[in-house]
Amino acid sequence: MSTLKPKIVLSRLDGTDWTRKGLRPFLEYRDLGLAEATEGRVGGTIGRAIKKFEPGGGAPRHTHNTSFHLIFVMRGWFRTEFEGLGEVTVRQGDCIAYQGQIPQEHIEYSDDFEVM
């Protein structure tokens, strides 16, 4: 039985702060309020490209310290490689979902790339 108190968070695009952080200097991020709504159990951001791709400018091999991860391409595309999946190009409307810490590398992206 859950001990969480009911909470609702509305994240509007207008007035949202976009921040630059983390492993990907080519993206800026918008926090969707999921961590606030779930007392830190779930997180979620939107990332969008802020500069043109340059060779070698993707995200090097890494893992995410999480039990579940979802990548949904909202706009554009990116070329990526996941252990167990291989190298793929993921396009607008495509989704990758996985559990655990799967090694991955993000190789290339479009100028209009936007991802949740």
Show where each model-derived region lies:
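A short hydrophobic beta-strand segment most commonly corresponding to one strand
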Residues: 44-45, 95-97, 110-116
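Residue-level recognition of conserved beta-strand positions in structured domain cores
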Residues: 46, 82-84, 108
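Glycine- and acidic-residue-biased ligand/ion/polar-headgroup-sensing regions
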Residues: 58-59, 64-84
